[in-house]
């Protein structure tokens, strides 16, 4: 039994409930409760927060969040095989764990959550980026969440915190850093999971700012950035020609040379360009 919550070790839970990870669901289960507890601590003081968790699987991180003192955890799990294991956790923490069986891409969790809200998850790799983009692109800011403590494949994590001029710099970096602080807070080796993935994983902490760093319309900025990085090796005057025949004038108005490439334009530069495009 675990000294954290007197529940069985994760290996036993996975064995007893026959929870072999399914590649089709993007599953890689964390095995070490010390690691899940460490991830939960990265989310900060949870005693006054509801926590949204996506893809809890056998419940390793769920247990860490509850042991860390989370006021309440709402866990969305698509794989019905995991529900009995999660029910065992709920029995140890009465009234503090609610489990929804469904697809996180199709469920609106807000009605089941009470602010303040934080998100913590070992995201299934096949939906992680899409969920992150949704969390980062609401029209209204600040968002419903205070912070996101999320595990990704290391390559994705590096894209979130990347700086201009690096190969990893792109849309994710701009969306994450425009209205939030983003940093990598943990690295995890493949053998921390079952089955072991081919690459290392990283935990990223994203904390919402009260307001954007620079003014810009979210829709326009997202559109401009997507177009620019879809053809990142092209000069911006070519990559953005779909925005209109006067795109060179708009680039110059934003202080950007039309011959520049997307990977060398700063966040401030893209926001200036979004304002110039919106002014047309």
UniProtKB/Swiss-Prot annotation:
EC number, as in UniProt: 2.1.1.182
Record's subcellular location: Cytoplasm
MF terms (GO), sorted A to Z: 16S rRNA (adenine(1518)-N(6)/adenine(1519)-N(6))-dimethyltransferase activity; RNA binding
Keywords associated with the record: Cytoplasm, Methyltransferase, RNA-binding, rRNA processing, S-adenosyl-L-methionine, Transferase
Principal EC category: transferase
Positions that bind S-adenosyl-L-methionine: 28, 30, 55, 77, 103, 122
Family assignment from sequence similarity: Belongs to the class I-like SAM-binding methyltransferase superfamily. rRNA adenine N(6)-methyltransferase family. RsmA subfamily.
Protein name, entry field: Ribosomal RNA small subunit methyltransferase A
Organism: Roseobacter denitrificans (strain ATCC 33942 / OCh 114) (Erythrobacter sp. (strain OCh 114))
């Amino acid at each position: 039994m675990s000294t954290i919550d007197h529940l069985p070790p994760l290996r036993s839970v996975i064995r007893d409930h026959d929870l072999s990870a399914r590649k089709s669901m993007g599953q890689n289960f964390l095995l070490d409760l010390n690691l899940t507890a460490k991830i939960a601590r990265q989310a900060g003081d949870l005693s006054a927060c509801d926590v949204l968790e996506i893809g809890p699987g056998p419940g390793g991180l769920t247990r860490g969040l509850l042991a860390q003192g989370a006021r309440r955890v709402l866990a969305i799990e698509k794989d019905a095989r995991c529900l009995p294991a999660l029910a065992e956790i709920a029995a140890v923490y009465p009234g503090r764990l609610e489990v929804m069986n469904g697809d996180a891409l199709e469920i609106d969790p807000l009605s089941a959550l009470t602010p303040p809200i934080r998100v913590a998850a070992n995201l299934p790799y096949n939906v992680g980026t899409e969920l992150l983009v949704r969390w980062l692109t609401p029209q209204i800011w600040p968002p419903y969440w205070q912070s996101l403590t999320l595990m990704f494949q290391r390559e994705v994590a590096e894209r979130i915190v990347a700086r201009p001029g690096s190969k990893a710099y792109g849309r994710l970096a701009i969306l994450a850093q425009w209205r939030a602080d983003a940093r990598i807070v943990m690295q995890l080796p493949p053998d921390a999971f079952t089955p072991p993935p081919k690459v290392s994983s990283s935990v990223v902490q994203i904390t919402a700012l009260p307001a954007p760093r620079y003014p810009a319309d979210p829709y326009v900025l997202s559109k401009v950035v997507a177009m620019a990085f879809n053809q990142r090796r092209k000069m911006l005057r070519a990559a953005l020609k779909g925005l209109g025949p006067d795109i060179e004038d708009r680039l110059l108005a934003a202080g950007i040379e039309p011959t520049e490439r997307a990977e060398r334009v700063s966040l401030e530069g893209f926001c200036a360009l979004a304002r110039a495009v919106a002014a047309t």
